[in-house]
C-alpha cells in the first residue's frame, strides 16, 4: 500500500497586531486571559503546540475580536 503524505502549513497567532491595535501590553493581556506572561509569550511567538478553545475565547473577549482576527493559516511551501 502506498503512503500518502500531506504537507501542512502552520497556524500563526497575530497577537502582537491586536495588542498594538488595542494599545495593550502583553502582561495586561495575560492577566485578563488568566495565563502567565511567559505562556502568553509562547503563544505570541508561535512556539505553542496547541491552544485550548477556552483560552482562544478568553483572548477574543480580552481583545474584543473574532478568532480570525488573531489566527492566520499559512500554507506549506512546496
Predicted regions and their residues:
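A short, Lys/Arg-rich alpha-helix, primarily the initiator
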Residues: 1-24
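Residues within the helices of the helix-turn-helix
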Residues: 16, 27, 57
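The alpha-helix within a helix-turn-helix
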Residues: 19, 30, 60
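Residue-level detection of the helix-turn-helix DNA-binding "recognition helix"
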Residues: 20, 34, 45, 75
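Short alpha-helical DNA-recognition segment
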Residues: 24-42
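Residue-level recognition of specific faces of alpha-helices
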Residues: 39-42, 55, 69
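Short, basic-rich loop-to-helix N-cap that marks the start of a DNA-contacting helix
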Residues: 47-58
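Short C-terminal boundary/hinge segments that cap the last helix of small helical domains
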Residues: 64-78
